[in-house]
Amino acid sequence: MSPEYFLRSLLLIILATFSANASNWLYLAKLSSVGSISEEETCEKLKGLIQRQVQMCKRNLEVMDSVRRGAQLAIEECQYQFRNRRWNCSTLDTLPVFGKVVTQGTREAAFVYAISSAGVAFAVTRACSSGELDKCGCDRTVQGGSPQGFQWSGCSDNIAYGVAFSQSFVDVRERSKGASSNRALMNLHNNEAGRKAILNNMRVECKCHGVSGSCEFKTCWKAMPPFRKVGNVLKEKFDGATEVEQSEIGSTKVLVPKNSQFKPHTDEDLVYLDSSPDFCDHDLKNGVLGTSGRQCNKTSKAIDGCELMCCGRGFHTDEVEVVERCSCKFHWCCSVKCKPCHRVVEIHTCR
């Protein structure tokens, strides 16, 4: 084999690996709906899936719209949590949807993997509970009386099914590679941390029964937390994420803190391998839109403040007129009427 042929072959392998980035399935969020998938051949046309995900799609046609909703949930929550950060989870119309930000082993990639695996688990579980799927329903293992004195009843969220489907669908690329590279280990860890954010925050919801509103006895069921709660938990984990490196315990490859003085991470924590860029400058090649034109808070000293958000470049101040509702009065029955009030406010945007 000639050196030139070897190099060309190696380049093709690298490009193929990149094109099959493990988060490419998030492109499903760009589709208006995949609920119309009724034939296996349609799965082949879904952009962003690797072959094993295509096979899962063919075996689980009815679940794919839940996967799409999970991807949308993940992107929307990411954009909410990072709305005041330099990197605000902006998406592109290409693969991967977050650009090369998620192909690097950064904190941001850790959060994306965690929130997206949680999104699929959440959306599939919700579809089970609402009766949308034939393959699953409510969690029937939660039955009978409880030590607290209430009766398990109602429709408990079948989180076990949602988590299992998320593991099978989202983790498939890393699993197919044998999960031996440090990046595969990082992705798998953060995927599981995302699902743990749901599992560890399951709630007990109850309904009282009795005469005249009394609570003679209660029936209760287990419910997932709101997805905003999941996002809040993972955002805290992002802020406290642990930088790790690969090590070996016997023949097993594991991730350990890069700084031995730091306490070991748990299954619930996010981990990362590489330092993040500053996200200040426009770099579309890497999916970084920069902060020029972003609104900032003139009085804040935090990351949303103009000094930090604008990376020291300064900012523009414009006055704009906004119309708000004021002098609202309740009219019997049953409406609220308000007057329009005009107010001039200052808007600060990064140079």
Swiss-Prot record:
Predominantly expressed in the diencephalon neuromere D2. It is found in: Secreted, Extracellular space, Extracellular matrix. A lipid is attached at residue 212 (O-palmitoleoyl serine). Gene3D superfamilies: 3.30.2460.20. Residues 1-22 form the signal peptide. Disulfide bonds join 78-89, 128-136, 138-155, 206-220, 208-215, 280-311, 296-306, 310-350, 326-341, 328-338, 333-334. It holds the Pfam family wnt. PROSITE patterns: WNT1. Keywords: Developmental protein, Disulfide bond, Extracellular matrix, Glycoprotein, Lipoprotein, Secreted, Signal, Wnt signaling pathway. One of its GO terms (cellular component) is cytoplasm. Its main location: secreted. Palmitoleoylation is required for efficient binding to frizzled receptors. Depalmitoleoylation leads to Wnt signaling pathway inhibition. One of its GO terms (biological process) is negative regulation of androgen biosynthetic process. SMART domains: WNT1. Glycans are attached at residues 21, 88, 297. GO terms for molecular function: cytokine activity; frizzled binding. Belongs to the Wnt family. PANTHER family: PROTEIN WNT-4 (PTHR12027:SF101), WNT RELATED (PTHR12027). Ligand for members of the frizzled family of seven transmembrane receptors. Plays an important role in embryonic development. Interacts with CPZ. This is Protein Wnt-4. It comes from Gallus gallus. The gene is WNT4.
